[in-house]
Amino acid sequence: QGSPNYGEGPVPEAMWISEVTFYCQAGFRHLLMSGVYERFPKLKYILTESGCGWVGDMLKQLDRIDIGFKHGSIGEMNYQRMQWVLKDKPSEYAARNCWYGASFPSKADLNGIDEIGEDRVLWGNDYPHYEGTFPYNLESLRLTFAGMSETRRRKLLGLNAAALYKFDLAKLAPLAAKHGPTPAHVNGPLPRDEIPG
């Protein structure tokens, strides 16, 4: 992802975690704006560990830039010699070619899901990293997914990944039945006194 080396100072992990999404977003922007998906229309790009709450706003920004270039309204900048390579809007390439692996997303992170499409988001728990949700995966799921429709929840928690990676759901069914969780496990809200401290 191109993150810098933060060295041995007192807070390198804090610096890294505060900027990690920036570097993920940079690659995402570069691929969308450079015409990669125009040249490789079957390419699938999956961002992981960067959430998805920011995607809708970024796609709106990139679409505005695209329109500006196509209609010559970028302001005082002169781009007449530049050949614009995008036939479609950046948001249209994202809708066809991009997915978002949201590691232990919060409810706020999923607020913009309708803008990017519920079929584009994949849940993750970031195991075995210490900042992930293990061993409190079920509690995390309840905090985020309680009250969400079962159809949407099933898509985010597994069906989207199964479709993207072409998993054989019939072969995976025994494992899912053994290891869960079931809809009943995650549908109820998590009371404050059950939140791990």
Where on the chain are the PLM-derived regions?
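Histidine/acidic residue-rich metal-binding segments in metalloenzymes
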Residues: 1-93, 107-119
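Residue-level detector of alpha-helix boundaries and kinks
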Residues: 14-17, 21, 97, 126, ...
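Short, flexible loop segments at the rims of nucleotide/cofactor-binding pockets, characterized by
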Residues: 22-25, 98-102
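Mid-to-C-terminal alpha-helical segments outside catalytic/metal-binding sites
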Residues: 34-35, 43, 53-54, 74, ...
